[in-house]
Regions:
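Glycine- and acidic-residue-enriched helix-capping/strand-helix junction motifs
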Residues: 1-10
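N-terminal active-site beta-alpha-beta segment that forms phosphate/nucleotide-binding
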Residues: 9-90, 95-99
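Conserved phosphate- and dinucleotide-binding cores of soluble alpha/beta proteins
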Residues: 94-212
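Flexible, glycine/proline-enriched loop segments at strand-loop-helix junctions
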Residues: 3-4, 77-80, 132-139
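N-terminal start-of-chain detector that recognizes signal peptides
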Residues: 1-2, 21-24, 71-74, 85-87, ...
């Protein structure tokens, strides 16, 4: 990352964290990925059952491996042997102790914007797990809510369509087609503007470019 952009992130990150805190979320700014990983692990009690959405940022940071190395109980849908077992794990994740995810976008005034295909990730964000830890690079931050929605729809969603190899217009040409195709990954769009109960959602902002 170019040094001027890093300086910008380090100056704006604490301000975005403060905006999230005003909306009843716990929020932390970590200048580096390494510091962010340690903060996430610190926030997860040893006995918690942990699960996650399909989250590139958590994979990029190696958090799953760190959890396994300390024998953390996890619900990992990728270990399912059948479609039925995978679906059961998706349901189990909704009642886990700690759910890990990123956010498709975050507005500077502290609102989270997330788009989901089947809705399991945004369902967990809204209700179910005892706590939700959102880990997001500062590249996810947009100036305002309209910008955050635009980022989620026109940057994150087309990139995720490439990741999931779906048959959607954005998977073909890289641009949102506002589609209703069978493989559409934009079934649900959730804006989180306030957290109840207070502190259930914890956001770890990272002064690096992570995820999609």
């Amino acid at each position: 990352m170019l040094e001027p952009k890093k300086k910008m992130y380090d100056k704006s990150g604490p301000r975005v964290a403060a905006a999230l805190q005003k909306r009843n979320m716990e929020a932390y700014y970590c200048p580096t990925a390494a510091e962010a990983v340690e903060k996430v692990l610190e926030l997860i009690p040893a006995g918690d059952v942990v699960s996650w959405g399909g989250v590139a940022t958590v994979d990029e940071l190696g958090i799953k491996g760190r959890l396994r190395s300390r024998n953390q109980p996890v619900i990992d849908r990728d270990t399912a042997r059948t479609p039925e077992e995978r679906t059961a794990m998706l349901h189990q994740a909704l009642t886990c102790d700690t759910f890990l995810m990123s956010s498709n976008a975050i507005s500077e005034d502290g609102q989270l914007v997330n788009i989901d295909g089947i809705g399991n990730r945004v369902a967990a964000l809204c209700f179910g797990p005892k706590q939700v830890i959102v880990v997001a690079g500062m590249n996810k931050v947009a100036a305002d809510l309209d910008g955050a929605v635009s980022r989620a729809r026109h940057i994150a969603a087309p990139a995720n369509a490439q990741r999931f190899d779906g048959k959607t217009p954005c998977a073909v040409n890289g641009q949102c087609g506002d589609c209703t195709s069978p493989d559409c990954i934009c079934s649900q769009m959730v804006i989180t503007r306030f957290c109840k109960p207070a502190g259930r959602i914890k956001v770890v902002l990272v002064g690096e470019e992570l995820g999609l």
